[in-house]
Structure formats: structure tokens, C-alpha cells
Amino acid sequence: MSKAISYVQNGEILDWINDTGSDVAYRDVIPSGGRIFVAGENIKAGNTGSVNTEGVYELPTDNTTTFTTGDTLYWDATNGILTKTPTAYKAGYATATKIQADTTAMVKIDY
């Protein structure tokens, strides 16, 4: 017995319903379901908009740690920064070395 399967889309960009109760701005990080997405447009609360599910982004981090290319990174939703400390939201992996003084880091988001 086989089931009908329908191809829908590549998946790099998905439609997302903004159920956060707040407007989301273009390029905001959206933590959801254990991962992060990046808003592809302004998305008003309750509306549907596009989110990026992969790509390399420069995101904020703090100046108390270093990252090495390939390190697994997480999103600290409370502070709005990348971290190596495991959180509920896996962000991806570092695509460049981050020295301690840096306040941003490059991350490849993908799933």
C-alpha cells in the first residue's frame, strides 16, 4: 500500500504564522520548536510571512566567550544572543572563529 506524496517546496523559506502576540521585524531571529528562523519580511502579529530556515547570518553574541569554526551554537532567547551553552533553541554552527572581544558571530542555520 502506498500513500500519495506531494512535493510542496524546497524548504529554505517557509510560510510562518506569527502567533507571538508581537510584530516581527525583517531579519529578527524567531525561536520556535527547538530551532531558530530568520524573518524574511516584517510580519505583523497574527499574520503569515516568510522565514528563512537556512543560510549564514551574523548574529549578536556577548564578549565573554570564543567560538571556533564548527562549534554548535544555541540561541539564548532571554538575552537575544548566540551562545555555546545549550538552550532550548539550537541555532546551527559557527562558520568563523569569534574572538572574545567580538559582539557578533557568523552562524550557519540549518536543519
Predicted regions and their residues:
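Surface-exposed, low-hydrophobicity beta-strand/loop segments enriched in small/polar/acidic residues
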Residues: M1-Y111
